[in-house]
């Protein structure tokens, strides 16, 4: 929702303040295929394995999401 940095539905999430729906101090992310222990995973980390004729997708180091490779089938 607007103004939220993270999903405040899970009070046990160590990255997200459930009362404010904001990331806790020092946290870069709260969830996502490229988020590990509240930090963005290193650029080049595989976040989605290739299937069929597709290629692996990799974290970019600046986002919690797993960007699709430009050659996604």
UniProtKB/Swiss-Prot annotation:
A motif (Cell attachment site) lies at residues 51-53. Expressed by the venom gland. The keyword Secreted applies. Belongs to the venom metalloproteinase (M12B) family. P-II subfamily. P-IIa sub-subfamily. One of its GO terms (cellular component) is extracellular region. Inhibits fibrinogen interaction with platelets by binding to alpha-IIb/beta-3 (ITGA2B/ITGB3). Also inhibits ADP-induced platelet aggregation. Inhibits basic fibroblast growth factor (bFGF)-induced proliferation of human vascular endothelial cell (HUVEC), and vitronectin-induced migration of smooth muscle cells (SMC). It also regulates platelet activation associated with HUVEC migration and invasion, suppresses TNF-alpha-induced ovarian cancer cell proliferation and invasion, and inhibits angiogenesis and tumor progression. This is Disintegrin saxatilin. Residues 1-73 form the Disintegrin domain. It comes from the Eukaryota. The disintegrin belongs to the medium disintegrin subfamily. Gene3D superfamilies: Disintegrin domain. The keyword RNA-binding does not apply. Keywords: Angiogenesis, Cell adhesion impairing toxin, Developmental protein, Differentiation, Disulfide bond, Hemostasis impairing toxin, Platelet aggregation inhibiting toxin, Secreted, Toxin. Disulfide bonds join 6-15, 8-16, 21-35, 29-59, 34-38, 47-66.
